[in-house]
Amino acid sequence: MAASALRSCLNRDSDRGPDIAHTTALQPVILAGGAGTRLWPLSRADHPKPFLRLDGAQSPFQATVRRLEGLEAAPPMVVCNAAHRFLVAEQLEAIGVTAAAILLEPEGRNTAPAVALAALHARADGVDPVLLALPADHRMDHPAGFRAAVPAAGRAAAEGGLV
């Protein structure tokens, strides 16, 4: 069952059923998985790098969420492991953002399965949005350039491109 649903998500032309609305809506997906091992000893399993306030103002996760401000997009979905769901909720609340969903990975298996989980969840409502997958821990020095590029990238993806 999950395999056929995943195939449906990936095959944008021939496998789309009539119950899926064609849309160019942009659905941000923030990938906040991880084990907290790369920035040890600051980063730990219970408080990994995306949630640390390394520069004192906000965490990389919060900076990623804030980067979406001003875009025509749905509220973000966040994919994380169960141990971090409360960190995600607390950090979203601290910056005044409500997530569309906090999706829990049954087991961390890197980017592709996390994005597939988000795609399946997004399609559950009968729409087929363009997903904007964002790692929760990347630093971006020029967020205005990112915001300027997203609309064109979204249009290209809606037309079937892999951006």
Question: What is the role of each PLM region?
Answer:
Residues A2-C9, D13-I30, T37-P41, A45, ...:
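Conserved N-terminal catalytic core of the sugar/cofactor nucleotidyltransferase
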Residues E159-V163:
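A short, conserved acidic/glycine-rich loop-to-beta-strand motif
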Residues G154-A158:
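Substrate-engagement module of ASCE P-loop NTPases
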